[in-house]
Amino acid sequence: MSERGAITCFNAHQAATVEAMAARIIPGSQDDPGAREADVIVYIDRALAGAYGHLQPLYRRGVEALDRRAAESHGAPFAECSEAQQDALLGDLLADVAPALDTPGVDEDTSLLSYFAAVVHQHTIEGMFGDPAYGGNRDGAGWKLLGFPGARWGYSAEEMRYGFDSGQIPVTTLEDLRRQRAGRR
């Protein structure tokens, strides 16, 4: 779990499950950061404590339903399944995003799980590529992956030149800009 921030909305099991989901959506390692290394779980937790607070019940019910599905399929809660098993479960859920309950063969858990997986997928993307001020994208990992230099006051003529490698520009966050501005006063 993250060293940058305390988890406040999730209990330890829920946090481990959502973090495992995010880590399969954007896998990584220490040398090639993914969602786990970029602290996406911190972003999701902070979002649920704030603007996305209305989604807390979805996350709680979603984790419970995902664990039931994982136990039925693989005999263990989702966070304890192998990466291959997690990939298979998530792949199935994301392939059929939020099927209607009146669809033949779709039960309440399947509909809930597909919607839940889609929301976690969206929040994982937000947490990986949003400004680090919101809890995820630790050290600009997502921005570095894209070659995006982050928040800027502007660009030089050289940086605007066609073919310029923006990966040469140091990553700058909103907090970096605030510090720069405060230093000018």
Please annotate each region the language model reported:
Residues 2-4, 14-16, 20, 39-185:
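Mature-region segments of soluble proteins
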Residues 24:
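Substrate-recognition/specificity elements adjacent to catalytic centers across diverse enzyme folds
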Residues 29:
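Glycine-rich, often acidic-flanked micro-motifs
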Residues 33:
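Short glycine-rich loop/turn motifs that provide flexible caps or phosphate-binding loops at active sites
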